A protein has these predicted regions:
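Long, highly hydrophobic alpha-helical transmembrane signal-anchor segments
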Residues: 1-39
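Short, aromatic-rich amphipathic segments at membrane interfaces
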Residues: 10-21, 214-254
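Membrane-interface amphipathic helices and adjacent TM-edge segments
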Residues: 45-94
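Alpha-helical transmembrane signal-anchor/signal-peptide segments
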Residues: 48-57, 112-133
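Short tyrosine-centred short linear motifs in exposed loops/low-complexity segments
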Residues: 165-167, 174-181
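Extended, hydrophilic extramembrane loops/domains of integral membrane proteins
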Residues: 182-238
Length: 275
């Protein structure tokens, strides 16, 4: 799984490389444009384009029929029934491209969350490091500590939560850069990246997880912990990022879907795609 995550992640690093020092909106606009083109290509080559065109024309004709015969209840009712029938047919034509798109879109969304979902820490800012243990381990029985780092300082002793199989520390960022947070468990060391005051568009991994298909799928930003590790995950509580639109703070997912749909509908005529 890591080989796929690493390779897939490199594609997004290449895409966003020119936008690292720019406002995140530029990177969002570009990836939304690419997504819109991808959706159009899928529709063009996997759907019944002729059938979609015919169905849309039928729906338009029956809508016009309702307007022309609005005083004739029977004809209007029949036209509405036909509109419903052709809408269902249109949905059936759209099902195949939607099925083709769903998995790639999920994989894209997971990667985009690394780029648009979190703020890096700022010097002086505090965050919580959460270490989750596997269920067979007790946090009271293990010796855990965080090694010193030039980029941050450990601001609290470990808080061991036996019921949650969890150990927490508070850290404070000191110096900008990407640093390795090294957690020692007995005689073993485990590393997690910490991002401090990075570029406006930066890949930030909130969690490093143990080898597990679903966990690795959802948190693909770092190589997973070894399967024999007592740790289930290492997490840093970065603050969530919003897209600023004239003072309105929007979740990146909303912006991404809206822009992708706008680009898709805006380019469908130019590319001669029926959707």
């Amino acid at each position: 799984m890591w080989f796929f995550n690493y390779s897939w992640g490199k594609i997004f690093e290449f895409i966003f490389f020119p936008f690292r020092h720019l406002n995140p909106w530029w990177g969002m606009i570009f990836i939304s444009l690419l997504t819109g083109l991808f959706m159009l290509a899928v529709f063009k080559y996997t759907s019944n384009q002729k059938g979609i065109s015919q169905v849309k024309n039928k729906i338009k004709a029956h809508l016009l029929e309702i307007r022309l015969f609005k005083d004739n209840f029977a004809l209007s009712l029949k036209a509405q029934g036909n509109i419903l029938r052709y809408n269902l047919k249109y949905i059936s034509y759209s099902f195949k491209p939607m099925l083709v798109m769903i998995i790639p879109l999920i994989l894209i969304l997971i990667q985009l969350n690394l780029w648009f979902g979190y703020h890096s820490l700022e010097p002086g800012q505090k965050a919580i490091v959460k270490v989750k243990l596997k269920k067979e381990y007790n946090p009271l029985d293990l010796k855990l500590k965080i090694d010193p780092s030039p980029g941050f300082r450990v601001d609290s002793p470990p808080l061991r939560i036996e019921e949650e199989k969890e150990v927490n520390w508070r850290i404070q960022a000191k110096k900008k850069g990407i640093y390795s947070l090294v957690i020692k468990v007995d005689n073993q060391s485990y590393q997690k990246n910490v991002a401090i005051s990075q570029n406006s568009l930066t890949k930030i991994s909130p969690a490093k997880v143990n080898k597990n298909f679903w966990a690795e799928l959802l948190y693909p930003g770092e190589q997973p912990l070894s399967s024999d590790s007592p740790l289930e995950s290492i997490e840093i509580t970065y603050s969530s990022k919003k897209m600023n639109l004239f003072g309105l703070h929007l979740h990146w997912l909303i912006v991404y879907f809206v822009l992708s749909i706008i680009f898709g509908f805006g380019l469908k005529g130019f590319l001669k795609v029926q959707i």
